[in-house]
Regions:
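Active-site helix of classical SDR
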Residues: 215, 254, 262
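Short C-terminal tail/terminal secondary-structure segment
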Residues: 334, 346-362
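Short, small/polar-rich loop/turn modules that mediate ligand/substrate recognition or access, typified
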Residues: 181, 270, 275, 345-347
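Substrate-binding pocket helix/loop in short-chain dehydrogenase/reductase
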Residues: 191-192, 196-204, 315
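Active-site loop immediately N-terminal to the catalytic Tyr-X3-Lys motif
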Residues: 193, 243-249, 271, 322, ...
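Residue(s) in the substrate-gating loop at a strand-loop-helix junction
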Residues: 238
């Protein structure tokens, strides 16, 4: 229909036909739905349509509303000055139209990863069990990137119902899911004789079962989006998932379980075009919440270190490159694995640890 309208009304100097798909769809009993390349433009289209309806209603209050004829409507739509303005607009970012969910969204790695995705045009749902903290992060991102592209949801990844609700919120707000960054986690350290069953279960509940619940809940949305391409899962693992760590058996083995889950999912889901990869960081202290928990006295204390600056120096000196590992470094790797730049990579692991010989590929 739109193509026929264009052919009837075009002039010799008319711009080429634009997207023939409808922008506004009116569904009786449901409402007005707008479709565009990004959430901001969709909202603006909805507002313009609403204002147009209000003008029509206002006109009907004093007489009959007379719509412009087809040719006049075409000349407005394909006005050459409007076309010149459109041609001068910057190219859309590589993540425009993509929808991501980031668990552990209030922490250092989660916020850095979300920021990296939104900077390239993605819409992001931040999920974190700390509702107040994740809402604060969301508010900051709304000011930075715009209120249309970010939402937050309270979610404990060990709670099956909360995980399901988080993905329902993602579908409701943005109509799908293209990228999952499974990042929610904890850190613990204790020798085996002091590792309680409760501590062991807590690590496996969050780091193994939590990743399983998150990935499983995402799958129905991924299945609906697979024809669009670019569907990607990124697990945030750990150097300790592949390198034995004395005094951290619960944490390290749970991380290893999550990494092997990623391998299994990569194998299972490749025929569906869903990619699954892992980023293994090490010693991310700056911007991390782990310094505020028991890990400070359990882990850092075993090295005789009780000041953050001393611990950062300890890990920096331990690395082969002698450099700090920051949340933004992990975010860069996660972004690459989520993007089309890695479209032919699945089942892989990237180490962002400033060089740790224990984790070298053997």
């Amino acid at each position: 229909m739109y193509a026929a309208y264009y052919e009837r009304c075009k002039r010799p100097d008319s711009p080429a036909m634009r997207d023939a798909n409808p922008v506004v769809v009116l569904v009786p009993g449901v409402g007005r739905i707008t479709f565009t390349t990004d959430k901001i433009t969709a909202r603006l289209a909805d507002e313009f349509c609403g204002n147009a309806i209000n003008v029509m209603r206002g006109a009907e209050a004093i007489g009959d509303y007379i719509a412009p004829d087809e040719q006049e409507a075409f000349d407005i739509e394909y006005w050459l000055l409007e076309e010149a303005k459109l041609l001068r607009m910057p190219a859309p970012g590589p993540m425009v139209g993509r929808i991501a969910q980031v668990t552990g969204g209030a922490g250092g790695i989660g916020t850095a990863t979300a920021a990296r995705l939104m900077a390239e045009g993605a819409c992001v749902v931040l999920a974190d069990r700390d509702a107040a903290a994740v809402q604060e992060v969301c508010n900051g991102f709304a000011k930075r990137f715009g209120r249309d592209v970010v939402r937050s949801v309270a979610c404990d990844v060990t709670d099956e119902a909360q995980v399901a609700a988080a993905f329902e919120a993602c579908a409701r707000e943005f109509c799908g899911l293209d990228i999952l960054v499974a990042n929610a986690g904890i850190a613990s350290s204790a020798p085996i004789r002091e590792t309680s069953v409760a501590l062991w279960r807590k690590n496996y509940d969050v780091l193994a079962e939590g990743y399983f619940l998150t990935a499983r809940a995402a799958w129905p949305l991924f299945e609906r989006m697979k024809d669009q391409g670019g569907t990607s899962v990124v697990f945030i693992g750990s150097k300790n998932a592949v390198a034995a760590a004395a005094g951290a058996s619960a944490y390290a083995s749970a991380k290893a379980a999550a990494n092997h889950l990623a391998r299994c999912l990569a194998l299972e889901c490749a025929p569906r075009g869903i990619r699954v990869n892992v980023v293994n960081p090490d010693a991310v202290i700056k911007g991390s919440k782990i310094w505020n928990g028991d890990w400070r006295k359990e882990g850092a204390g075993t090295h005789g270190i009780y000041a953050r600056e001393e611990l950062e120096a300890h890990y920096r000196n331990r690395s082969k490159l002698g450099r700090d590992v920051l949340p933004k470094d992990i975010a860069e790797a996660a972004y690459w694995l989520a993007s089309d730049a890695s479209a032919k990579s699945t089942g892989n692991m990237i180490y962002v640890d400033a060089g740790n010989a224990q984790a070298f590929t053997r």
